[in-house]
UniProtKB/Swiss-Prot annotation:
Residues 1-26 are annotated as: Disordered. It is found in: Nucleus; Chromosome. Its main location: nucleus. GO terms for molecular function: DNA binding; protein heterodimerization activity; structural constituent of chromatin. Belongs to the histone H2B family. The modification Blocked amino end (Ala) is found at residue 2. It comes from the Eukaryota. This is Histone H2B. Can be acetylated to form H2BK6ac, H2BK33ac and H2BK34ac. Monoubiquitinated to form H2BK143ub1; may give a specific tag for epigenetic transcriptional activation. Keywords: Acetylation, Chromosome, DNA condensation, DNA-binding, Isopeptide bond, Nucleosome core, Nucleus, Ubl conjugation. The gene is HIS2B.
Length: 120
């Protein structure tokens, strides 16, 4: 019985002495793990979170943020505006989040913006 032909490993092309390594840009990753942990400790001081669960929460927050930002951007473009205002963010929240969750988040955001602008 004949053995299957073995493939030779591919060799990388050799570099000239004057040629430099090409560095790839690392994709920027925004992490909110610290803030998730701070909120967890405010709400439930006696509960911890595993690193795997923290990674999932971080991905979830980044995903929601990305979706809200792109939806708000789309709304600004539809209205021929070059600036995303709180109104676009609020509308994006209403479009992306379901019913009661959207109402709750809009009221919380309004409260936070009011607190921020009053300087308290």
């Amino acid at each position: 019985m004949a053995e299957p032909a073995k493939k030779k490993p591919k060799k990388l092309p050799k570099k000239d002495k004057g040629q430099k390594d090409i560095k790839r840009k690392k994709k920027e990753s925004y992490t909110v793990k610290i803030y998730i942990f701070k909120v967890l400790k405010q709400v439930h001081p006696d509960i911890g979170i595993s690193s795997k669960a923290m990674g999932i929460m971080n991905s979830f927050i980044n995903d929601i943020f990305e979706k809200l930002a792109s939806e708000a951007s789309r709304l600004a473009r539809y209205n021929k505006k070059s600036t995303i205002t709180p109104r676009e963010i609020q509308t994006a929240v209403r479009l992306l989040l379901p019913g009661e969750v959207a109402k709750h988040k809009v009221s919380e955001a309004t409260k936070a913006v009011t607190k921020f602008t009053s300087g308290a």
